[in-house]
Amino acid sequence: MWSADRIQRALRLAAEAHQGQGVPGTELPYLLHVTQVAAEVMTVSGGISDNTTAVLCALLHDTLEDTELSAATLKAEFGAEVLAGVQALTKDVTLPKEQRMADSLCRIREQPPQIAWVKLADRITNLQTPPAHWSSEKISAYKVEAQQIYDALAEFSPELGVRLAQKIATYPPMAPP
């Protein structure tokens, strides 16, 4: 059953955890990014009548990686299933940088399909105009990584797979004048 109360709690926790952070290359609060990811996830049903866990993971997907929020707090507030999803979406910083995405994708594939939806939605929302300070090499590498995400996870959501493929095909978009 959908739980508006749990979603509102997750939104508040994400807002508190990400307070002071911005969307890279913009003046916008980081909360915009996590709500965009959640909105993408909400468009997918995948034959599941209750996407609450997916939406919670979308709202909280960067909290362990980018904030001081602890795994214990996440588990206490939202349970083991949400914690496992967020942990799978979190890159393991103890690994060499070039291994982190592959490791995360393997862990995501071991989770329920909704966790893959979150990663697909995350990259869809991230494939906007890159920050001005990014080099052409970084932009190219980001596009290659997006293709790796598509290759590993698109099967879990044809709808999000199509959206990600479209974003990859047009990345990087032209910066607005």
Cite the ranges covered by each PLM segment.
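Active-site helical microenvironments for divalent-metal-assisted chemistry
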Residues: 1-177
